[in-house]
Amino acid sequence: MLLCVVCLGVGGCSSLPRQDGSSRNGGSSGGTGGNVGVLSGVSQGDASDAAIYAVGLVGTPYRYGANTPASGFDCSGLIGHVYKTRTGLNLPRSVAALQQWGQSVQGQELRAGDLVFFGRGAVASHAGVYVGQGRFVHAPSSGGTVRLDLLSAKYWAAQRLQYRRP
């Protein structure tokens, strides 16, 4: 039972099929029907820097529960490491908690550094960092590596749930 609770708490990412092809956080803001979560105050420059840094981590091994270049990354560990390293923010460690963080944005409003969420239900099971030009960086599955993928790829387009801006 304790093991189940620990696994749910870490909640990195679901295993996805292979494909070829803080402390600085502000308070909660209300009044927009749940579209605004914890606002961080990350500047666009810092968010872009985080996206560039994320691209540099492509090829790092996937490892469930890991969050450093030396140990590898799961999806939430990758996002947390990128934002901690480039902005000093301590982000939530689970995809479900990240899904409540920042401000909801529409797909046509995406900017480098925004977070993208995927899943088949209301709660996301996977997330990545948008880097521009329709692409995102993520740590997708056991046995894989951090990679750059297109949001428009059939697999990802079918699962897109939400976009959030730090």
Annotate the PLM regions:
Residues 8-12:
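C-terminal motif of bacterial Sec signal peptides marking the signal peptidase cleavage site
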Residues 14-42, 46, 89, 105, ...:
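Aromatic- and glycine-rich peptidoglycan recognition patches
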Residues 37-40, 60-112:
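Catalytic cysteine-centered active-site loop
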Residues 1-2:
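Bacterial N-terminal signal peptides that target proteins for export
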Residues 46-50, 54, 74-75, 79:
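Stable alpha-helical elements in mature extracytoplasmic
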Residues 113-114, 134:
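Structural motif
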